[in-house]
Amino acid sequence: MATEEFRGHAVRMSTQGSQPGAAPDSVAGTAGLPSGQSGGAGLRLGERPPPAMEKRGPYLVTRAPSIQAKLKKHRDHAKAVLRRKGMLGALTNRPDSSGKRSVKFNKGYTALSQSPDENLVSLDSDSDGELESRYSSGYSSAEQVNQDVSRQLLQDGYHLDEIPDDEDLDLIPPKPIASSACSCCWCCLGDSSCTLQ
């Protein structure tokens, strides 16, 4: 394979025999070079490097630039814009040695100092005792909710028993198996010889 430099990028051309309809290698290799420029000439500022060209048979195939080249071009363009606006200083290339990150806030936002002794939320209340009695922890307890519901029902006219009726809710024992028909086949009709598994 023959390799030729094309403005800083390698161009590979296959040296094949003459094929019908194929352009000669010398014509295809020099087609992209403007007259008067050498192959190793550097790029001017703002001039794009040509894409890498590869000849496959009678065709010239351009390869897309790599992602690293695209990212570098994007970074260089962003630096140039910031330099023109005067926002790019000499301190941007030096990493921060203190280990702390500085945070930039958008317009209208202020930073909260989140020290443990400072409340992030303030509630309007006349007394702190009332606040602590209703919201003693982050979770509402079931007893507190139950008392509030009972108080509201009493105000609405419903009279609830003060003693819960848990004792009255015992389950009724089931009937003996011998007195009823077999549940598996209904054939026994009280015969004790059939047992349930």
UniProtKB/Swiss-Prot annotation:
Residues 1-77, 117-142 are annotated as: Disordered. Keywords: Phosphoprotein. Signal peptide: none annotated. The modification Phosphoserine is found at residues 14, 125, 127. Coiled coil: none annotated. InterPro entries: FAM219 (IPR029339). It comes from the Eukaryota. Belongs to the FAM219 family. This is Protein FAM219B.
